[in-house]
A protein has these predicted regions:
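N-terminal "pre-motor" subdomain/linker immediately upstream of P-loop NTPase catalytic cores
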Residues: 75-79, 85-184
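Charged, low-complexity terminal tails
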Residues: 1-107, 120, 129, 134
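P-loop NTPase catalytic core
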Residues: 237, 246-249, 258-280, 284-479
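Phosphate-interacting basic helix/loop segments used at nucleotide- and nucleic-acid interfaces
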Residues: 99-110, 211-215, 303-308, 357
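P-loop NTPase nucleotide-binding module
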Residues: 208-265, 304
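P-loop NTP-binding catalytic core
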Residues: 160-230, 236
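Flexible glycine-/small-residue-rich
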Residues: 114-118, 126-128, 140, 158, ...
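Short flexible coil/turn linkers enriched for glycine and charged/polar residues
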Residues: 106-108, 116-120, 130-132, 148-152, ...
Length: 479
């Protein structure tokens, strides 16, 4: 069939796809049209086979019932047949039962994330949110009837109706995102929820926590629904800071669903984070630097949809992403050229999806929140990275700025306290904390950056917790 489609022109393929109801054909290339047609052929073949199996089973049941009713009473008292005839019948029954067992296997339990395709059908993915050999087909009728969406975690039963089927089909659905199927059908769409400013604080400070967490907790407080950026030069400690935030969240908020998304990252960093951050509600999703840009793009989109589905169930979700800059680079290589180019070779169209991802962070009035903390790279020697940062600069409502000059002087954490901060932090800090931060920021005026940070770090080191630090600042009226 592939050869037949490939022999046709793109215009003819487009007409065929249009007549079959395939969406988004105007932007597809010939190879994409061929794949879409083949995918629909496979989906239709699977549906047809499922219907045939159901009809065959119903017909067999009816025939058995009729034969049982019409059987004469004397037949039940008939003597045993000759041994050779009995042997032949037994052999025939065994052959039929063997064929039936290979044709329709026993249902198996399946669990994974749903990806709905353009043509309406879907697949349950299992490994790292990406296609694999053990994916499960979900029929369009099931998706429409149960209001299923990309990003839903489905638990149910599957089986192959034919040995030649590439994928098993979903036969029974038990839960959607851990909730009853009926609840999923009645949920409100993410886009219809009302976003408000973060007003519930996520405290990163805990007994025995590092100075970095104590500083971030006061200088750039994080609330549920925050959209924050960790701006860093190379080797300034952004990944370490992200890891410490993840540890604090898993310890203090075990019910919060934490997704760590690593894009274009080193494989050893992925292993380190997976082993360091563990919990019942923790997912580490990754796409290492040796993968194609399309792989980065697909993984990030699945993570975004997964988080939205959880928020629709009024869950609190946090995504820690490293990094938004590398995601923008991946989209710059995959989007169709718009004909315009910014400094550094960046296509403006490449920023749409990264902004959509980052902009999904919000606190919902109806309940639930999506918090996103993403790292952004600056001063890498690439003009494109600086342009990406400038484009995202005003979109967040919280920033932590790391300075490599401080780290080179062995000042850790290398946080530029003067430039870091949170919008509307009055909704998150109490009066004593606000007053102490005002005193601290006023005292930094006129001081060199490294001197000010060292002085503040010294004071943090001589206090056991933030409460003690605030009391000391308010008492002395200086830091």
């Amino acid at each position: 069939m592939r050869e037949k489609y490939e022999s046709l022109s793109a215009a003819v393929l487009r007409e065929l796809a249009k007549s079959r109801g395939i969406k988004g054909i105007s932007s597809m290339k010939k190879s994409q049209l061929v794949e879409a047609m083949l995918a629909q052929d496979e989906a239709e073949a699977t549906e047809t086979k499922m219907e045939e199996v159901e009809k065959k089973e119903e017909h067999t049941k009816e025939r058995t019932t009729v034969a049982h009713r019409n059987r004469p009473a004397s037949e039940g008292r008939r003597e045993h047949r000759p041994s050779n005839e009995h042997h032949d019948n037994t052999r025939t029954e065994r052959t039929e039962s063997t064929a039936d067992s290979s044709y329709a296997e026993e249902p198996k339990r399946c669990e994974g994330i749903l990806e709905v395709m353009q043509d309406g059908f879907g697949f349950i993915r299992s490994d790292n949110y990406l296609p694999g050999d053990h994916d499960v087909y979900v029929a369009p009728a099931q998706i429409r009837r149960l209001n299923l969406k990309t990003g839903d975690i489905l638990v149910g039963k599957t089986k192959r109706n034919n040995p030649t089927d590439k994928f098993g089909a979903l036969m029974q659905l038990d839960t959607v995102n851990g909730f009853a199927v009926e609840e999923a059908a009645k949920r409100t769409n993410f886009e219809d929820l009302t976003p408000i400013f973060p007003n519930q604080r996520i405290r990163l400070e805990q007994p025995g926590s590092s100075v970095a967490m104590r500083i971030v907790d006061l200088v750039s407080p994080i609330g549920k629904g925050q959209r924050g950026m960790i701006v860093s030069q190379p080797k300034a400690g952004k990944t370490t800071l992200l890891k410490e935030i993840a540890k604090s969240v898993t310890t203090s908020y075990p019910d919060m669903h934490l997704i760590i998304l690593l894009i274009d990252e080193r494989p050893e960093e992925v292993t380190d984070i997976r082993e360091a951050i563990q919990g019942d509600n923790v997912e580490v999703i990754y796409s290492t630097f040796d993968e194609l840009p399309e792989h980065h793009k697909r993984v990030s989109e699945m993570v975004m949809e997964r988080a939205k589905r959880l928020v629709e169930h009024k869950k609190d979700v946090m995504i820690l992403m490293d990094s938004i800059t590398r995601l923008a680079r991946a989209y710059n290589l995959t989007v169709p050229p718009s004909g315009r180019t910014l400094s550094g070779g960046l296509d403006p169209a490449a920023l749409h999806m990264p902004k959509k991802f980052f902009g999904a962070a919000r606190n919902m009035r109806e309940g639930g929140s999506l918090t996103i903390l993403a790292t952004a790279l600056v001063d890498t020697g690439s003009k494109m990275d600086d342009v990406v940062f400038e484009e995202f600069k005003g979109t967040g409502n919280m920033e932590v700025i790391l300075d490599r000059k401080l780290s080179e002087k062995r000042v850790f954490p290398a946080i530029d306290i003067a430039k870091s901060g949170t919008r509307r932090d009055d909704l998150l800090l109490n009066k004593e904390e606000q007053e102490a931060m005002e005193i601290m920021r006023r005292g930094m005026n006129g001081m060199r950056k490294d001197e000010a940070v060292e002085s503040i770090l010294n004071m943090f080191a001589h206090t056991r917790n933030n409460k003690e630090y605030i009391a000391k600042v308010l008492r002395s009226r200086m830091f």
